[in-house]
């Protein structure tokens, strides 16, 4: 229906244009004289140009969008966007309005006018312009189309076209450099060490020793055995294997972006330490990552954190009850939330008894205090053997140092 209305308006304007030309010619014929013909010939170039423009296809234009950088963008970075407009036919145009339609995800920081320019092509076939996006927010931003608009000098003929051109921009969360340290679980009865598995690194031989029952045949050091006439086996370096499970609360919160930033910081710190980790993130698009280590795991987790949204309608305490049991017991559990609730503390206390180490990181906005109820729940958590650490952004660096001292 909308297309039909636009088509009818275009036809009407063309008919009016021919009518004006006919009226100007008729006036000159009947009136005669220099002035009448001067007005007619003065109007003719504009009239003929309007007729030409009415039949000029804007489909002749191609529009490209390029970014000065991509792939390594983080929250808060700036970006330069270059828009290139090209066409095949060099028909003169008085003006051309080009608008790079801003995604809704950038509407708060990027006014629509920022991506719009008025160009004066004349006979040019190629034009460019640039605009900047400052302080990119975390997330997936999809640029999908351009709007082109031109017209004649008298404002009678106007032509518009939407050019589809998709460009995806993924902005990863920023992070704070921090040092991850293995934690200890403290109960009223005393202190118990965290469950750290000791594994032999069979690629690193530290020495030889006499054979012991249970040693594998592949561990036998044949040269040492031949020299001593006693079966000798290789001695390997022992490495700590510390598994961590991060649970991200995705219920809507004013401090959600800070939570994501802190989560990215600890993901980087844990994997950099050489430990293995997994993540649970439940919302409209649930995500559960098995416990692994390495660069690929970090890429997966950062990709998820770049796109994650605060869209969970389920309290984090209930999620813990239903989801965490699928993971092995000997893990350190780090729960990241913005609010301390009774249900969360009770569920965390249950897992603390089974798993040994549970830490609740409560992320608050700058100068936002802990509520009275939250303070009471914090005492309850301590009695159940659960660490609770309230953090504001400047304190992220010392998150694990302070927990260790708690």
Where are these regions (language model features)?
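A generic local structural motif
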Residues: 5, 231-233, 318-322
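An amphipathic, basic-hydrophobic helix/alpha-beta surface used to engage anionic
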Residues: 45-295, 332, 336, 350
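Acidic, glycine-rich A-domain
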Residues: 268-406
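Extracellular/lumenal glycan-associated context and N-glycosylation machinery
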Residues: 1-65
């Amino acid at each position: 229906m909308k297309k039909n209305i636009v088509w009818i308006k275009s036809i009407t304007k063309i008919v009016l244009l021919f009518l004006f030309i006919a009226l100007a010619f008729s006036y000159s014929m009947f009136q005669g004289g220099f002035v009448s013909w001067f007005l007619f010939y003065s109007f003719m170039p504009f009239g003929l140009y309007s007729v030409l423009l009415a039949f000029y296809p804007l489909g002749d234009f191609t529009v490209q969008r390029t970014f000065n950088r991509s792939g390594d963008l983080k929250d808060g970075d700036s970006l330069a966007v270059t828009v290139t407009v090209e066409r095949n036919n060099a028909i003169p145009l008085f003006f051309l309005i080009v608008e790079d339609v801003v995604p809704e995800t950038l509407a708060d920081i990027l006014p629509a006018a920022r991506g719009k320019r008025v160009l004066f092509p004349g006979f040019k076939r190629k034009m460019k312009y640039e605009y900047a996006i400052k302080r990119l927010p975390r997330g997936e931003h999809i640029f999908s189309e351009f709007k082109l608009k031109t017209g004649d000098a008298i404002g009678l003929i106007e032509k518009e076209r939407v050019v589809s051109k998709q460009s995806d921009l993924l902005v990863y969360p920023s992070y704070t450099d921090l040092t991850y340290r293995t934690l200890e679980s403290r109960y009223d009865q005393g202190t118990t060490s965290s469950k750290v598995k000791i594994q032999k690194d069979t690629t690193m031989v530290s020495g030889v020793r006499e054979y012991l029952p249970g040693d594998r045949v592949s561990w036998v050091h044949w040269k040492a055995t031949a020299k001593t006439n006693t079966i000798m086996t290789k001695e390997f370096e022992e490495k700590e294997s510390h598994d961590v499970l991060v649970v991200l609360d995705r219920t809507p919160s004013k401090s959600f972006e800070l939570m994501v930033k802190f989560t990215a910081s600890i993901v980087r710190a844990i994997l950099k330490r050489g430990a293995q980790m997994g993540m649970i993130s439940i919302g409209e698009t649930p995500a559960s990552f098995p416990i692994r280590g390495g660069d690929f795991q970090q890429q997966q987790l950062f990709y998820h954190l770049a796109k994650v949204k605060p869209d969970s309608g389920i309290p984090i305490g209930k999620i813990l009850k239903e989801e965490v049991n699928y993971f092995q017991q000997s893990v350190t559990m780090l729960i990241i939330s913005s609010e301390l609730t009774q249900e969360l503390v009770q569920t965390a206390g249950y897992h603390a008894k089974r798993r040994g180490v549970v830490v609740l990181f409560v992320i608050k906005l700058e100068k936002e205090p802990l509520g009275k109820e939250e303070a009471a729940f914090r005492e309850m958590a301590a009695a159940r053997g659960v660490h609770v650490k309230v953090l504001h952004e400047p304190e992220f660096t010392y998150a694990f140092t302070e927990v260790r001292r708690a």
